[in-house]
């Protein structure tokens, strides 16, 4: 994945006649330790954490690729608003089971970027506004932004919120517990159901929302029923 994605980026730059002569390189962040929103310089500790991350996701490659390109350009490399931005208020961390605490993993980069863009469009600063921001993609984030901080948001990676093209979202806990102890599945398989093979993929065998939406608009089932849900 690393070489493929890096070479893809370099090929696109070459095709667009953009020389490797940058003042800085910035990338999407990865699944690092929880951190407030902001821009962070890429260093050896960050790269080590990404290479040894507990959770796998393509976003873990962003900083590594940016750092390599930046070295060729002799310029600094950064990430901005990684998926692990954690600005939750204390009450948002609590669940009905004391041993389980909610964590903040969401599409922070896009959510904060569109918030700033919207704020600018109405002549305001992001830090002045209270917003509900929704990201729709392979996963779905629904976040409460209070004066520039995301004080509550669903865990868009590991089983909260609406189901999405590849993720199961919030599901009945009792039925999940029964599934886990049914003897039919390993822990790895259950986790894949929650993230990777859940949602539209589980129901329809594909994550191509364009195709699914077209079939649904034509009234074809089960595409219409699942997409409406």
Question: PLM features: residue spans?
Answer:
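Short, well-ordered amphipathic alpha-helical segments that serve as non-catalytic structural scaffolds
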Residues: 4-16, 114
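Short beta-strand-loop/turn "lid" adjacent to the catalytic site in phosphate-handling enzymes
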Residues: 13-58, 76, 84-95
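Gly/Ser/Thr-rich loops at beta-strand to alpha-helix junctions
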Residues: 30-33, 135-141
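Glycine-rich phosphate-binding loop plus the immediately following alpha-helix
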Residues: 60-68, 79, 86, 94-130, ...
């Amino acid at each position: 994945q690393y070489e493929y994605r890096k070479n893809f980026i370099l090929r696109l730059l070459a095709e667009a006649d953009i020389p490797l002569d940058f003042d800085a390189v910035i990338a999407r962040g990865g699944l690092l330790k929880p951190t407030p929103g902001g821009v962070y310089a890429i260093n050896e500790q960050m790269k080590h954490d990404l290479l040894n991350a507990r959770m796998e996701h393509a976003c873990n490659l962003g900083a590594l690729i940016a750092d390599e390109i930046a070295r060729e350009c002799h310029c600094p490399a950064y990430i901005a608003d990684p998926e692990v931005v954690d600005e939750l208020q204390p009450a948002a961390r609590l669940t009905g089971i004391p041993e389980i605490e909610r964590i903040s993993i969401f599409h922070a980069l896009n959510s904060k970027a569109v918030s700033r863009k919207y704020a600018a469009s109405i002549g305001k600063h992001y830090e002045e506004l209270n917003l509900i921001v929704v990201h729709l993609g392979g996963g779905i984030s629904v976040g409460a932004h209070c004066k520039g901080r995301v004080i509550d948001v669903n865990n868009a990676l590991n089983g909260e919120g609406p189901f999405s093209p590849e993720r199961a979202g919030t599901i009945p806990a009792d039925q999940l517990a029964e599934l886990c102890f049914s003897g039919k599945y390993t822990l790895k398989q259950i986790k894949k159901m929650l993230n990777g093979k859940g949602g539209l993929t589980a129901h329809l065998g594909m994550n191509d929302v364009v195709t699914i939406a077209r079939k649904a608009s034509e009234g074809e089932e089960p595409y219409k029923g699942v997409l409406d849900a």
